[in-house]
Amino acid sequence: LLALDSAPSSQSSSPDSCVGPVICGGGGGVPVVARGGSTGLDAVDAVIDKDATSLLLASLLGASALLLLTDAEALYDPGDWEASRREERRPEAVPSPASPGEVEALLPLLPEGSMRPKAAAAARAAREGIVAGIGSLQDAAEILMGTKGTLVVPTRGGGGG
């Protein structure tokens, strides 16, 4: 959904004409390829990385913040995850605000298909100068304020630490 300040036209579809939130990116359709010598198309497995897509949109739109919302309340410390499950308690969240380097150090320890893409996108966003938040949908405003969830923030000097 792209909210524009006037009726859509070829002149008004740039990010500069947006007056509301941009919500897009995701799956759908069946990707296909033409194999050498074949006259038909074959379906291939492909998944849209919605976190990387969100980061790309944030970068293209010049966003100052990116929220990666999920059913988890924050980016949890992967070293505490299993222990917390055995002890039936909430795992410890990664201290917030976190630097891109702190989050990148956790990437190999995070589950591949769930939190790792969010953490990777958040770290890259911060390296690009965009504040990134990870947490639950109902906490979106508090994540931006830094009172809930995990914020990954650009470090001074632009290197992203």
For each feature predicted by the language model, list its residue ranges:
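C-terminal catalytic "cap/lid" subdomain
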Residues: 1-161
